[in-house]
Structures are given as structure tokens and as C-alpha cells.
């Protein structure tokens, strides 16, 4: 099947690429790469240094030359201090110590009393520094000549440098990565699984508020969340930041130690009332504005011991008030100072439990916090939520999650979408204030694992073709669970990570296997119900989503719209008008996905299909029952090819899905999603169906 791509689309894409490259070049140049300064070894990123395990390098320019000091190890160390003329002058350096510092576990030594001849070449501080060195070295058989070339190169970031040593006697070069002294240094702390008022939430809330202050200007404090946490990636991402982003982490063990470490970032404290749960949510708003931490009365002595001043005491002030009254009071008092680009719904669990994982990000951005009901029947809270959202800037982010006690996900996303805004969940989203400051590698390009090239065809046979998409794939999903990479599998991409947490997005792309295929989600540039969006605002949301699709090399886009109820008590179908907006707004997409549970919208335009899910794999469904379900769907949909799209809930892993697929028999074939979509566009056997509005 040939896919027609207009010259206009090609030109637009080329223009975007050129703009991205130009901006990257300007940004890189503006960051002033230079070798001068003090550098420390990133030991996990290069060749091991025998015995010493550490290396510091100091580089400075002086009249007609340079000073270079290499220090191997610490107290039991070796220092090589050189003052050299540049421009190819032969500098003679006497050998005063027999230590061969890069490889002390090899039987080599320097002949004391001899000389090293070093020629230095260095045009300017940003250019590589090259040293050509000749000397003798002693082995067990006597002297041998040795030629070495040392190259110090700044980049790819201003705080990184590579140092390579090529020797005439060694086949492979020695390579080190160093970072500027004091850069990429952070602390981490393992959080306890305590989220109940009176049983540990007080400490957790304090620490998360401290994180929001500590990370305001740089990535300084990272938390490893317990295994039960919604987002299960905090341990491997910590390893990634250490091993690939070259962070050095110091472990913190107690709240007192954490406060001592980051006290300079704290201007005071806000006291919340343990008898009024909502007061903690309000306290996060105030604390973000006042650069304060949130504490209950048990932590006040620690504040006093550290000389911190009280900014607000909510004890007794909100007793007996409804949530609507509390949030109206808070908004009247603080709303004008809060961000119009970010707002936090600190919902989720209720009662005496709260899991405020995203609070650090909200505080960092001076966001207003609430858990207002978005259910129309709760008129007072709903009306206040509606008024607050109406004051937000276009395309602003509504982060966190709805209250499980007050309303439903569909209520929350519908109201947000009706204002042309976008949701990014959840309330448990961890470490965003840290990850936001960790940049992707300069020049990193997002590459999806496409299985079929632009303009290529895929002709189906008389089979049942199955393709699987994992919900919340890179966040709550099975990314770190067994089986990933064993079968073709598609994953929803949290597209806003491209700017909210760019290194996180790089992490997922760089750890993807050839069988992992990414799809854009969900309904817009974030979580959006397009049917609920005002008609004049939908094109702008789609255009923003398309920008991220292009950046992230995504060719399939997923829509989910529960604005008119679920599959059973309402509908999740799309109107022809809404589908048309995506077809026209995303001309580079090869196809679209619709639904969560099974949905019933199907279409093809220019061989680009819109396919709804035909099956939802419940985490509680046994493998045998799932196989029976899929066989029955194939019997009902008897024409071949039959395109059976499966949505996998985040609680299932790939190994389980593979086991189900393996039991289906020879009439079924698992297809990569892009191949599946291409085949469905080439030979659709589904009937066109749209939601008809009366």
C-alpha cells in the first residue's frame, strides 16, 4: 500500500527539523563549552582506574601555555602537575616518581631521573586540548619506548568533559568522563510506605514539600518510593541518573538530616491541622508561595531548632468548614499569587490517607492545590472548580488526579477539557521537580521502532491479526515487568515528558527494544476528551499534540473520550466531526486508535484507519477465559482479515499477554501496531461507524 505524502507536509517537517537543529546549536553555543576549571571523575562512565578509583583534573590557561594537574586517588594518591607551553613546543618534564598512575596493577613503572617530552596543542578554551607525549617505561624486560596522546574534550554539556589516552602499546584507548566539580551532585532518600494521618503521613508530607523547595533551581533531592507506589520506576530511574546522567548521590536517612542539608532553601513553615485533612492540601498551596515546608504540630520543635519562622498556622481555622468553603477561602486569599499555567488536583485516596507525590512539582510552580469535586451534582464544589479552571491560561496543565471519594475520572477530565485545558496524572507522580531539571543528552533524537517505512505497503492475508497496546505504558505500566521485548507490543507515551521531564523520556526511548512501539496519547497534548472541548479550541489542542508527535517520532495517535459516559452506561464513540479534526490536524499520522474498553467507532480516510478497541484484557481475567473471548470475537467477525485490537490494563505484564497469544492457534497472528494499522488501512473489513448526534 502506497501512502501519499504531500510536498507541503514534507517541507513542513523539514522546516521543523531545521528549526530544532538551529535552536539546539544556538543553545549549545550559548552554554559556553570550556575546559578551564576543576573536574572530577565519573567512575561508572569510563575505564576503571586501578587502586585509586578517582581522578581530578584542573586546567587553566596562562601566558603562552597552560597548567594541567591530574590527581589520581585521594589521601593515597598520585599528583602529576604540569606547566606547559602550547603550540607544539617540546616541553621536557623530569620523572620524579616511578608510579604509572593509570594502571598501577600492571607491571609498569616510570624510570626516575628520565624525562617526558610533551607537546601541547590548544587553540582556545572551547577547543580540545591535545598532549603528545613520548617517554620510556620500565617493564620486567627493561626499558621500552612509549608514545601517548592525551585528548581533553569539553561537552557534550558544559559540565562534562571526556579525557582519552591513546598509547602506542595499547590496542584500545583509555577513556574517562569527568564532570565539573560541584555539578550533578544530589541526595536521595528512600520513603517509607506510610501515608496515613497520625501514622507517618506527617513526615512524608514534610519531605515532599522540602523536595519542592530543594529542587526549585536544580535537581538536588530524589526520592525512591516504596514498591507499592503507582509509579514503579523510581529505583531504576535513580540508577539511570547515576549511570547515564552522571549524578553523584548522597543518601539521606532522616527528616532532620534532610532539613539540615537543604535548610538554605527554606524560609519558613506552614502548620496544617491533623483534624482537618483538607488543611494539608491548602498548606501545600501556601508553602509553595512562601517557600516553606508543611508540618503538623509534632514537627514544630524541629522547625524551631533550625531557626525557621512560622508562615501560617491552620490549626483550628478551618474546623467545621466544608471543602467548598475551605477552598473558596484559600483561593480568595492566595489565588491571585498562584500560577495560571499549572494547577494541582491532590485527589486520589481519601479519608485519613493521602499520597501527595506530585506536591513537590506544584509547590515548585506556585500552583493552587485542591481536590474539588468535578461532579455536576456537587454544585458548590463543581461551580468553584469551574470558575478556577476558567481563569487558567490556554493549554495549561491540570496535574494530579481527581478524588476517588468525590467524583469519577470522566467527570474530572470532562470539566478540564471543556475549558480547553489538559490533564496530566496522577497525584502520585513522583520526583517531577527533580526530573524537570535533568536535560536530555544534547543532540539526542527520539527514534521510534517503526516496522514499516513511509510510503510502504503491508498486504494482509486471510488471518485474524491482533495488536496490543499497554495502557499508561511508560508510567504505571509493565515497562519493568517480565516479558518486555519478547513480542511486538505498543506502549502509550506520556508525550508531555518531552518537556516536563526530558531525561525521563530519553530513558524510555533509550531502553526500548526493537519490539517496543510507541503511540501518542491521549486525546490531545495530554489527557483530553475531544468531544468536550469547545470547537474553537480543539484545533489548537490537536496542533500541540501534533508538535509532540513529530518530535517523538510517533505515527499512531490514541483517543479516549468518556465525556458522555463509559461503554456500558453511555458511549465512548467519536463523532465524524471530531474524527475529521484529527485527520486534518495530524496529516502525518498513519492511523488512530479509539477507546479504553471496547468502543465502536471505525473509519478509513486515505488508507488511514481509525480503529476502536475490540477487546479489553482485564487484569482479573484468566488466560483461558481471555483465549475463549478472543476465539469468540473471531467467530463473530468471520470475514478475513479481521483486525482485533487489544487494550491491556497496566496491571498485566507482557509475559502474561504472550502466554495468551501463544494459546490462540495458527489462524491468529500478532502484528506490530504500525503494520497492523497499515494493513487495516489497506484492506479494512470493519464497517464505518460514527456517533450520530440527534
Language-model segments: which ranges?
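Short, hydrophobic/proline-enriched secondary-structure or compact coil segments at domain edges
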Residues: 62-74, 161-165, 263-278, 394-405, ...
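Mature N-terminal, pre-catalytic/accessory segment of carbohydrate-active enzymes
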Residues: 181-334
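Non-catalytic propeptide/linker segments at domain boundaries
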Residues: 360-484
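Catalytic grooves of carbohydrate-active enzymes
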Residues: 383-393, 397-400, 459-478, 484-486, ...
Amino acid at each position: 500500500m502506497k501512502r501519499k505524502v504531500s510536498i507541503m507536509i514534507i517541507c513542513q517537517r523539514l522546516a521543523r527539523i531545521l528549526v530544532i537543529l538551529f535552536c539546539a546549536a544556538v543553545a549549545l553555543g550559548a552554554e559556553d563549552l570550556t575546559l578551564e576549571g576543576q573536574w572530577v571523575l565519573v567512575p561508572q562512565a569510563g575505564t576503571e582506574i586501578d587502586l585509586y578509583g578517582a581522578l581530578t583534573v584542573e586546567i587553566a590557561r596562562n601566558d603562552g601555555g597552560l597548567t594541567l594537574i591530574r590527581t589520581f586517588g585521594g589521601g593515597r594518591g598520585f599528583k602529576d602537575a604540569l606547566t606547559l607551553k602550547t603550540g607544539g613546543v617540546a616541553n621536557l618534564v623530569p620523572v620524579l616518581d616511578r608510579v604509572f598512575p593509570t594502571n598501577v596493577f600492571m607491571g609498569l613503572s616510570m624510570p626516575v631521573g628520565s624525562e617526558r617530552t610533551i607537546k601541547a596543542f590548544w587553540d582556545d578554551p572551547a577547543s580540545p586540548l591535545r598532549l603528545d607525549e613520548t617517554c620510556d617505561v620500565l617493564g620486567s624486560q627493561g626499558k621500552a619506548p612509549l608514545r601517548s596522546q592525551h585528548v581533553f574534550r569539553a561537552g557534550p554539556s558544559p559540565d562534562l568533559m571526556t579525557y582519552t589516552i591513546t598509547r602506542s602499546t595499547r590496542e584500545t584507548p583509555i577513556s574517562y568522563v569527568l564532570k565539573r566539580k560541584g555539578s550533578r551532585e544530589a541526595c536521595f532518600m528512600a520513603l517509607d510506605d506510610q501515608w496515613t494521618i497520625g501514622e507517618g503521613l506527617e513526615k512524608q508530607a514534610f519531605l515532599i514539600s522540602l523536595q519542592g523547595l530543594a529542587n526549585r533551581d536544580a535537581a538536588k533531592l530524589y526520592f525512591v518510593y516504596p514498591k507499592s507506589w503507582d509509579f514503579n520506576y523510581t529505583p531504576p530511574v535513580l540508577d539511570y541518573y547515576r549511570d547515564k546522567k552522571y549524578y553523584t548521590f548522597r543518601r539521606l536517612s532522616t527528616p532532620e538530616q534532610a532539613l539540615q542539608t537543604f535548610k538554605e532553601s527554606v524560609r519558613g513553615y506552614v502548620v496544617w491541622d491533623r483534624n482537618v485533612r483538607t488543611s494539608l492540601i491548602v498548606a501545600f498551596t501556601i508553602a509553595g508561595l512562601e517557600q516553606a515546608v508543611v508540618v503538623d504540630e509534632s514537627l514544630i520543635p524541629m522547625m524551631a531548632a533550625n531557626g525557621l519562622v512560622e508562615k501560617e498556622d491552620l490549626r483550628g481555622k478551618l474546623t467545621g468548614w466544608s471543602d467548598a468553603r475551605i477552598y473558596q477561602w484559600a483561593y480568595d486569599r492566595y489565588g491571585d499569587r498562584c500560577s495560571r499555567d499549572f494547577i494541582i488536583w491532590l485527589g486520589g485516596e481519601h479519608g485519613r490517607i493521602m499520597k501527595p507525590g506530585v506536591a513537590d512539582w506544584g509547590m515548585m510552580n506556585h500552583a493552587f492545590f485542591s481536590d474539588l469535586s468535578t461532579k455536576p451534582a456537587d454544585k458548590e464544589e463543581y461551580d468553584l472548580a469551574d470558575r478556577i479552571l476558567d481563569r487558567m491560561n490556554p493549554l495549561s496543565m491540570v496535574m494530579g488526579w481527581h478524588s476517588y471519594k468525590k467524583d469519577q475520572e470522566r467527570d474530572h477530565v470532562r470539566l478540564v477539557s471543556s475549558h480547553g485545558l489538559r490533564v496530566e496524572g496522577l497525584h502520585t507522580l513522583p520526583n517531577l521537580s527533580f526530573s524537570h531539571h535533568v536535560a536530555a543528552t544534547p543532540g539526542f533524537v527520539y527514534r521510534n521502532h517503526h516496522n514499516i517505512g513511509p510510503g510502504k505497503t503491508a498486504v494482509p492475508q486471510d488471518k485474524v491479526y491482533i495488536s496490543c497496546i499497554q495502557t499508561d505504558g511508560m508510567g504505571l505500566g509493565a515497562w519493568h515487568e517480565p516479558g518486555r521485548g519478547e513480542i511486538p507490543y505498543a506502549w502509550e507515551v506520556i508525550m508531555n515528558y518531552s518537556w516536563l521531564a526530558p531525561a525521563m523520556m530519553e530513558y524510555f526511548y533509550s531502553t526500548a527494544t526493537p519490539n517496543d512501539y510507541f503511540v501518542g496519547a491521549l486525546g490531545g497534548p495530554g489527557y483530553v476528551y475531544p468531544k468536550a472541548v469547545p470547537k474553537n479550541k480543539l484545533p489548537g489542542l490537536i496542533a500541540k499534540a501534533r508538535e509532540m508527535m513529530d518530535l517523538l517520532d510517533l505515527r499512531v495517535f490514541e483517543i479516549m473520550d468518556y465525556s458522555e459516559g463509559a461503554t456500558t452506561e453511555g458511549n465512548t464513540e467519536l463523532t465524524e466531526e471530531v474524527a475529521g479534526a484529527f485527520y486534518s490536524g495530524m496529516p502525518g499520522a498513519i492511523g488512530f486508535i479509539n477507546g479504553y474498553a471496547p468502543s465502536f467507532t471505525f473509519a478509513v480516510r486515505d488508507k488511514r484507519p481509525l480503529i476502536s478497541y475490540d477487546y479489553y484484557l482485564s487484569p482479573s481475567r484468566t488466560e483461558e477465559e481471555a483465549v475463549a473471548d478472543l476465539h469468540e470475537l473471531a467467530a463473530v467477525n468471520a470475514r478475513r482479515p479481521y483486525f482485533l485490537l487489544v487494550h491491556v490494563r497496566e496491571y498485566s505484564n507482557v509475559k502474561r499477554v504472550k502466554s495468551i497469544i501463544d494459546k490462540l492457534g495458527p489462524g491468529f497472528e500478532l502484528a506490530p501496531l504500525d503494520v497492523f494499522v497499515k494493513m487495516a488501512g489497506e484492506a479494512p473489513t470493519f464497517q464505518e461507524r460514527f456517533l450520530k448526534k440527534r
